[in-house]
A protein has these predicted regions:
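Bacterial N-terminal signal peptides that target proteins for export
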Residues: 1-11
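Alpha/beta-hydrolase
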Residues: 139-142, 177-179, 261, 495-498, ...
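Conserved alpha/beta-hydrolase
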Residues: 166-184, 539-557
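A conserved hydrophobic secondary-structure block that centers on an alpha-helix together
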Residues: 114-179, 201, 208, 229, ...
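Alpha/beta-hydrolase-fold serine-hydrolase catalytic core, especially in secreted/extracellular enzymes
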Residues: 24-121, 133, 295, 301-303, ...
């Protein structure tokens, strides 16, 4: 439709700049040929985001009253981030002692229990032979020390047996339990680290939650034993066991003393310094609430807590350990319990050293037995691993190897709403969950877009222009606009959300005529036929086409090696983000940039994407107004295949997102099975929306 002459003149002047804040010069400069250093960009971004979380950690706590008012909510948040809110049902442990292993000073019971039905925990219970009253008990949680022979796993309890033996020889009951991955039944810790199970992020699942729950039930078991004083329970463990010591001490106040060894450092070490690359998934909660790690430790206060580490530990570096200690010390000082917090640093690398043993033993003696005597006996391994094995044959009903499928349940398919009020309640609940649980890390106060025109040219009747804008601090992106040359407004603006293959196709076509404007891109072989087809279609339809590659694609790509790709995605995760979730934000900012140009707010916008980018476009449309149409190719039918958004499957899945989008946008699904989208179609029919709101094309 033709506009008034005044609007047409304004459009003719401004369409050439589209996103600039002033008039476009008569001759646009060529794009600077220097490409963005994607590695430097993402490193700066991670540092900025890490600093933001560090500065927020415990910043609101200035008094004991502040802390006490928030402590229970912090505990609830941690439980949620471990997948334990609500807590699983405390079912019958079905504990079984399968045998005993003898020593002159103690007996080892080889046992198993089920923390949940079918989730087996194998362990060794070390009992002093000499006992006349209930004794203090230690839960010893093991690190990543596999014990395996001829394809048979004896569990990491065999590797760490010397700790249980020492405690039993000194008046403690000690339960040493296997971990999920390195137990006699070998489950999975390395879901994202090794097996590309990025859907764990959608589910809000982490194996840290399984380890924490197993610890809770291990305390239940210890308290059921007549040999144990239920009010004197300690926890310790090293490396992975140090991490699990933090989980259980923070969430379960039955722990009266804790010594996590080599089990904590801060986000600066993990994200900026790269320690994440040496850790598996069991080390991390799903950081929905964007904590730094001192907040994991602080809930232990004011109970006796010893942070123990070596000075040359490469995956728990000394500087981060000390920073964590200093933050936690603030909370202990609020309680006037400075003496209940200790920091032990010994010489050495990431290794189970005798120096680390001694202080842990003394700490437990002091706080659980009121015994300040010197340590006279060292910790020794007395048994061969097979002597500590629990199962002769592994149970057929075990769920350990697949527990990641069920531990955090996905939301069931919801009912089709009966009326508009019911639908509004459902939709608003999903949107709130997305804002608070999936996209919480989006900038609350985003920076100015800082539009900049970086190149423009007219050839073959079309104008091609390049623009840079800020998605958020440190993330500067480039978008390209192609449109028929002339004064008229476009009939619509088609925003293409590009993955690597789609970007390659676009570059191959448009470099035929606009290679100079594409400098800074890695250009493929030119495709003259594709260029001809694109130009003819664009001119015939009188459309403007905008191409946006979100962060990490094209000019902003970082190290393409598989390892670095995995570890950068894990960095996002540690910051309470996902790469896909922040790409949704990038698309939102691109849409805002288009809308910001004079004369464009009322021009219909269509979003195009394929595969995961179709899902990213879909979610962007839920938070940006007036998206006329979504053209989505190969949209994943569920989130298991992307996009990966924190916690999303705890609340909804792709069909519900499509239903929400269909309320305000026409959706065209390319190459889709209509049966996969029956929920969205049923919502449309039930609420009397336009039948064309959801269309299928092959």
């Amino acid at each position: 439709m033709r506009r008034s002459s005044g609007m047409t003149i304004a459009w003719a002047a401004l369409v050439l700049v589209l996103f600039s804040q002033g008039a476009y010069p008569a001759r646009a400069p060529a794009i600077d040929g220097d490409a963005i250093d994607g590695d430097a960009m993402i490193a700066e971004y991670f540092e900025i985001e890490t600093t933001r979380l560090r500065d927020a950690c415990l910043a609101e706590i200035t008094s004991l009253e502040d802390w006490e008012a928030k402590r229970s909510e912090y505990r609830r948040q941690l439980l949620e981030m471990l997948g334990l809110d609500p807590l699983p049902e405390r079912t019958d442990l079905q504990a079984v002692v399968t045998g005993q292993t003898e020593h002159d000073e103690f007996v080892v019971e080889r046992l198993h229990f089920q923390s949940s039905p079918g989730l087996y925990v194998t362990g060794n219970l070390y009992l002093p032979r000499s006992r006349s009253e209930p004794l203090p008990a230690i839960l010893y949680v093991c690190g990543h020390g596999a014990s395996r022979r001829d394809g048979i796993s004896f569990g990491n309890k065999a590797t760490y047996q010397h700790h249980g033996a020492w405690f039993a020889r000194h008046g403690f009951v000690c339960l040493t339990i296997d971990t999920l991955q390195m137990g006699e039944i070998e489950g999975i810790h390395h879901g994202t680290y090794r097996y590309d199970m990025w859907w764990w992020l959608n589910r809000g699942y982490t194996p840290a939650g399984v380890e924490a729950w197993n610890c809770v039930r291990a305390l239940d078991y210890l308290q059921s034993r007549p040999e144990v004083d239920p009010d004197r329970l300690g926890v310790t463990g090293r490396s992975g066991g140090g991490v699990y010591s933090w989980w259980i001490a923070a969430i379960d106040e039955r722990i009266t003393a804790a010594v996590p060894v080599a089990g904590i450092t801060d986000l600066e070490n993990h994200v900026v310094d790269g320690c994440v690359e040496g850790h598996c998934d069991c080390m991390y909660m799903v950081n929905t609430y964007q904590w730094d790690y001192p907040l994991v430790a602080a809930p232990v206060a004011p109970r006796p807590l010893l942070l123990s580490n070596t000075d040359r530990d490469s995956i728990f570096p000394l500087d981060g350990v000390v920073r964590t200690y200093e933050q936690v010390l603030r909370v202990y000082e609020l309680y006037d319990q400075r003496n209940n917090l200790g920091l032990q640093i010994t010489a050495g690398p990431h290794r189970d050293t005798q120096e680390l043993h001694i202080h842990a033993f003394r700490w437990m003696n002091q706080h659980l037995r009121d015994d300040d005597s010197m340590i006279e006996k060292a910790a020794f391994k007395f048994f061969e691993p097979q002597q500590l094995k629990v199962f002769a044959t592994l149970p057929e009903d075990q769920k350990n190897t697949e527990i990641h499928e069920t531990f955090v349940p996905a939301a069931p398919e919801p009912p089709v709403p009966l009326d508009d009020p019911q639908w509004s309640t459902m939709r608003d609940g999903w949107l709130q969950a997305l804002r608070e649980k999936s996209f919480r890390a989006w900038p609350a106060d985003p920076p100015d877009l800082a539009f900049e025109v970086v190149g423009s040219a007219v050839r073959d009747g079309v104008r091609f222009a390049a623009y840079d804008f800020d998605s958020q601090q440190a993330i500067r992106l480039r978008m390209y606009m192609v449109q028929p040359d002339g004064p008229n407004l476009p009939q619509r603006i088609v925003v293409h959300v590009l993955d690597d293959p789609a970007l390659t196709e676009m570059l191959a076509a448009y470099q035929v005529a606009f290679a100079e404007q594409l400098s800074g891109e890695t250009l493929p072989e030119a495709d003259a036929e594709a260029y001809r087809v694109q130009v003819e279609a664009l001119v015939a339809a009188q459309q403007a086409h905008v191409y946006i590659a979100p962060r990490g694609i094209g000019r902003t790509a970082w190290d393409p090696s598989p390892r670095k790709q995995v570890q950068h995605q894990r960095r996002f995760y540690l910051l309470g983000q996902t790469l896909d979730g922040m790409r949704v934000w990038d698309v939102r900012r691109a849409i805002q940039a288009v809308r910001a140009a004079d004369g464009l707010p009322d021009v219909p916008i269509h979003l195009h994407g394929a595969g995961t980018m179709a899902g990213i476009a879909l979610y962007a449309s839920l938070f940006e107004p007036r998206i006329a149409q979504l053209d989505l190719g190969d949209l994943p039918a569920d989130h298991r295949h992307g996009p990966y958004l924190l916690n999303v499957n705890r609340y909804l899945d792709m069909p519900q997102a499509v239903a929400m989008a269909a309320q305000h946008s026409r959706i065209v699904l390319q190459d889709a099975d209509p049966q996969d989208w029956s929920y969205a179609k049923n919502v449309i029919d039930a609420l009397g929306w336009e039948p064309e709101a959801l269309q299928f094309r092959q």
